[in-house]
């Protein structure tokens, strides 16, 4: 007998298939694409800072780095600062951590959730710096750069995910503790940005991790919007108080 392939039937069958999802509701995808894009962007920006004389490190940092005194006038700095780095070691550590954490988290959370955790953690880091800086002090004019706030948000997300699945969290707790000590004791390290990223990353990832199974997408979207609005509101309030 000869079989006849019905094109329309095949299309309907494919359309009716449900997208495979991870345990936390993210779409199953191959590879950590967002992680690779974020690492690539940071590396390219740093290469521009170093290799092209016209795009000097100081020029990019002054235009895109976070400075509390300029935040209300140039709000893009809250996020663009996360794509700049001060030196090779700064870039190397952050990109290594992003590569390792992103490679583990992105497949579990899904691309859009992972992206939101990363960007909101970066915003949270800048917001914490903003609130803990004062016009009467040098901190108000201090330039801050780096993806560390976002990376600390990923540390927090890793802790949340491991707790959600009942896994041992002692390793990630020890790693965060070591980095926290370095943040507080090291020179020219913004512990405020690290703390802000850690807190926001934990909140956002907890929303994703413990959202009711039947309402994961709705709760995830609502929670993401709520956190973003809260951070913007805090930034606006700080601007009014300064």
Give names to the regions the model predicted.
Residues 1-27, 184-242:
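C-terminal transmembrane module of polytopic alpha-helical membrane proteins
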Residues 31-145, 184-192:
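N-terminal TM1-TM2 helical hairpin plus the immediately adjacent luminal interfacial "cap"
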Residues 53-57, 137, 165, 212, ...:
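Perimembrane helix-loop junctions in membrane proteins
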